Design a protein with these regions (language model features):
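Residues at the ends of beta-strands that form strand-to-helix hinge/output surfaces
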Residues: 86, 102-103
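The feature encodes the CheY-like receiver
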Residues: 56, 74, 86
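Conserved acidic carboxylate
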Residues: 8, 32
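Active-site beta3 strand of CheY-like receiver
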Residues: 44-50, 55
Length: 125
């Protein structure tokens, strides 16, 4: 089963995303801040990470940089999922190392398609 780490501090988003992802057959684990997310990624080795950008403790941009700088986690795809919707926000997320960027509210069909593409591309290591 594909395990997705969802790093998000908003309980409503956690509930909605976990429900939708679980219905699609994904195993979802949650971290509620960037620091906990980096730690969990290192210990759990998820297949993919969904990363909010506006997080407490360590923001999503820095958490992504930390993940991509570590040999343990650099191969794990990171998709930014954020209320930040400007082109500059997308650029910053991609520069930090995110593999893609989705603005909230998220088109779930497009997100699921991206997850499937990343998994079938062999990035699920």
């Amino acid at each position: 089963m594909t395990t997705i780490l969802y790093i998000e501090d908003n309980e409503d988003n956690i509930f909605l995303f976990t429900r939708r992802l679980s219905k699609k057959g994904y195993d979802v684990i949650i971290a509620r801040d960037g620091e906990a997310g980096v730690s969990m990624a290192r210990s759990e080795r998820p297949s993919l990470i969904l990363m909010d950008l506006d997080l407490p403790v360590v923001d999503g941009w820095e958490a992504t940089r930390l993940l991509k700088a570590s040999p343990e986690t650099e191969h794990i795809p990171v998709i930014a999922v954020s209320a930040y919707a400007m082109a500059e926000d997308r650029r910053r997320a991609l520069e930090a190392g995110c593999d893609d960027f989705f603005a909230k509210p998220v088109d779930m069909k497009a997100l699921f398609a991206k997850i499937e593409t990343l998994q079938s591309d062999g990035t699920d290591k």
